[in-house]
Amino acid sequence: MALRKCACIDTLYTELDWLDRFQAAKNDGFEAVEFWDWRIRDLDATREAAEKAGIAISGFNGDADYSLVDPTHKQKYLDYLKQSIAAAKKVGAASVTIHSNALGDGGIVVDHYDNLSHTVKLCSMYDTLLACAELAEKEEINLNLEALNITTDHVGNFLATTQMGAEIVRLIGCPRLKLLYDVYHMQINEGCICDTISNYGDTFGHIHVADAPGRHEPGTGEINYKKVIRH
C-alpha cells in the first residue's frame, strides 16, 4: 500500500490556533492531516484552511458516544456514522475511524460492558460492522477500525488485538472496511510488530505511529522504527 505522511493536528501544533495548524503541517512536509472530533470544529472553515494550505484531510473519529459491542446501540451507531460520513464529505475526507467501544474525555472507555459476555460483544461488533460496511460501500467512504491498548490508555476496550480485527475485516470482505494499525497501541498489547505487519498488513487502511512507552515521537522509546519502516 502506498503511504503518505499524515499529522494528527489534535496532538501536534497545539501552540497554534486550529486553522493555522494545516499550513504548519504542510510546511513540515506532511501530505495530510487528521483529527478526533468533528463535532467541535467549524467544518466549512476547516475545509477552507486545508484547501488554502494545499493539504488533504485524511479523516476523523466517526463513532463518538456509541459502541459496536453493545447490541442495543446498533441503530444509534449507524445513525451517528451517517452524520460522520456527511461531515467527512463536507471537508473532503476519505475516511472515518471507528472503535469497538465509545470513548470519553481523554480516551477513557465509557463502558466496559462487564455485563456482556465475550461472545455477545463479538457477535454484536460483527453484526454492526456488516451494516457499517454496507453503508460505507453505498457512500463511497473508507472505515478504519482501530484496536487500542488496554493497559495504559484505554482500559476496558474490547478490540485489543490485530488478529481479531484483521479476521473480522477479512470475514466481512468489504474493501471499504480496513484496520487502523496503531504501532504504539499494539507494541503495548502484543509486540511482534514486524511479524504482525507480515501477517495482517493486507488488512491495514491506515497506520498510526508513536513510540512506547510514553507515546512520544518515534526514536524516543523502545520500538525499532527503522526496522518497522523497512518491513
Per-region residue spans from a language model:
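Active-site-proximal loop/turn and secondary-structure-junction residues that shape catalytic pockets
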Residues: 11-13, 37-39, 63-66, 100-104, ...
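N-terminal pre-domain/capping segments
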Residues: 1-94, 119-120, 170, 174-178, ...
